[in-house]
Amino acid sequence: MVHVIAWHYNPENRNAILARFKETGGLPPAGVKMIGRWHGVGTNKGFCVAEGNDPIALAKWAQEWSDLMKFDIYPVVNDTEMAQVLS
């Protein structure tokens, strides 16, 4: 299953986030494959697209950062999958 993981943070957490990102790379845990990650230029927002069927692994990944950022995680479908829903 594919998920969008969107985040935003308070500006005062910026330096701590950058330090942790440099240290860890922000990589997902086993069971989650990151397809891509994008950072809003000049904003405090970003998102990634990740694939995995383990909700515990997704939750652990978010939990690693939840002291610094807020997350919205939701499953998504592509056009072909949506066509199946609509038929």
Q: Which residue stretches match the model-derived regions?
A:
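A common structural junction motif
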Residues: 25-28, 65-72
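Short S/T/G/P-rich N-terminal loop/turn motif that feeds into the first structured element of a domain
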Residues: 1-45, 53-56, 77-87
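Short, electropositive alpha-helical surface patch
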Residues: 58-65
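Conserved catalytic core of Hanks-type protein kinase domains
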Residues: 51-52, 64
